[in-house]
């Protein structure tokens, strides 16, 4: 399949990952992209979803829409995260099947993996345990996309695939302290501390947990590659192939933002999953994907983007 001659529907297309996927589709020659925005279409309402497909008439669906957040947001809203993600996925795939969509790309999450899966995570270990408790409702909801896609492939010969991105970062991320993930949260804290002349930044947890991070533009490229080239029922990991502790991450962000004060780790806050890192062999062998943005470069771009956006907001509110 080539996206250049297809009508592509991208749910969540104006979000953090979505805007980069739309840009990547355009780089691959796709000129007919429909972006679904929440204020225009509620994917948890079947009537909205039905109308969407009748209007857009897509050949391909890339389902990115999700209710997401960091450890705190997952802890406070487990029911919302489960229900809304399950409903959006189930309704979107069902109506894609009904109208004869040629390819459905379900974008899952590393949170689907068992809490104590061997590191690096292999796709074959996806069902060998329950996800980490702090984000299990979200992870299980996204995992249902995989189950539904495999069931539809078996019963209806519906071409659905499932990709598993690791933690993402980059420009246009969510920097809201109430719901952001670790990188934007630390970037914001350090930048604000520098501006305020503060001598301390408080980080959640022990700092011992490890994570892998994939630059958002690299992930977008991987998703389009998978759309064109991957046609198997098995899930496929999308990652950068490295692992870093939260403590080392915080020190790196502090250095890049110019924060020279003290990093304090609040051990009363949860670490989340002890380790996260993906084996990316399947993606490399199946559609030639390898991340091209090294971590310090990606962080620098993210920090600079945040500083520019912060300055713009300061001007508009002055």
Sequence positions of predicted segments:
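C-terminal substrate-binding subdomain of Rossmann-fold SDR/epimerase-dehydratase oxidoreductases
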Residues: 22-28, 192-318
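Active-site Tyr-X1-5-Lys
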Residues: 133-166, 185-195
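NAD(P)H-binding glycine-rich loop region in Rossmannoid oxidoreductase-like domains
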Residues: 46-85, 98, 115
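Adenosine-cofactor binding site in Rossmann-like domains, unifying the SAM/SAH pocket
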Residues: 28-51
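Conserved Rossmann-fold NAD(P)-dependent oxidoreductase catalytic core, especially the SDR/UDP-sugar
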Residues: 90-135, 161
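N-terminal Rossmann NAD(P)H-binding glycine-rich loop of SDR-like oxidoreductase domains
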Residues: 6-28
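Short-chain dehydrogenase/reductase
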Residues: 82, 86, 134-146, 176-184, ...
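Flexible, glycine-rich beta-alpha linker
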Residues: 42, 112-114, 137, 161-183, ...
């Amino acid at each position: 399949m080539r996206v250049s001659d297809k009508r592509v529907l991208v749910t969540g297309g104006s979000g953090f990952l979505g805007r980069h996927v739309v840009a990547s589709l355009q780089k691959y020659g796709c000129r007919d992209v429909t972006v679904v925005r929440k204020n225009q279409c509620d994917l948890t309402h079947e009537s909205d979803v039905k109308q969407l497909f009748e209007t857009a008439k897509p050949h391909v669906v890339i389902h990115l829409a999700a209710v997401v957040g960091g450890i705190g947001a997952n802890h406070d809203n487990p029911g919302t995260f489960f229900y809304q993600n399950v409903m959006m996925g189930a309704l979107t795939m069902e109506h894609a099947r009904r109208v004869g969509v040629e390819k459905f790309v379900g974008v899952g999450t590393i949170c689907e993996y068992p809490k104590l899966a061997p590191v690096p995570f292999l796709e074959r270990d996806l069902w060998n345990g329950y996800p980490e408790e702090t984000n299990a409702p979200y992870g299980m909801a996204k995992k249902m996309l995989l189950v539904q896609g495999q069931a539809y492939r078996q019963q209806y010969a519906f071409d659905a695939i499932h990709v598993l991105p690791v933690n993402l970062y980059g420009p246009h991320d969510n920097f809201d302290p109430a719901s952001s993930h670790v990188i934007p949260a630390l970037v914001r804290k350090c930048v604000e501390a520098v501006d305020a002349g503060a001598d301390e930044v408080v980080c959640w947890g022990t700092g011992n947990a490890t994570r892998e991070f994939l630059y958002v533009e690299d992930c977008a490229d991987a998703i389009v590659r998978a759309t064109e080239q991957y046609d198997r029922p098995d899930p496929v990991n999308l990652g950068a192939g490295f692992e870093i502790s939260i403590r080392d991450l915080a020190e790196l962000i502090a250095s890049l933002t110019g924060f020279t004060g003290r990093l304090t780790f609040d051990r009363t806050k949860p670490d989340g999953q002890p380790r996260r890192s993906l084996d990316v062999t399947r993606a490399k062998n199946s559609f030639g994907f390898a991340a091209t943005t090294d971590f310090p470069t990606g962080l620098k771009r993210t920090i600079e983007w945040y500083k520019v956006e912060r300055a713009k907001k300061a001007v508009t509110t002055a």
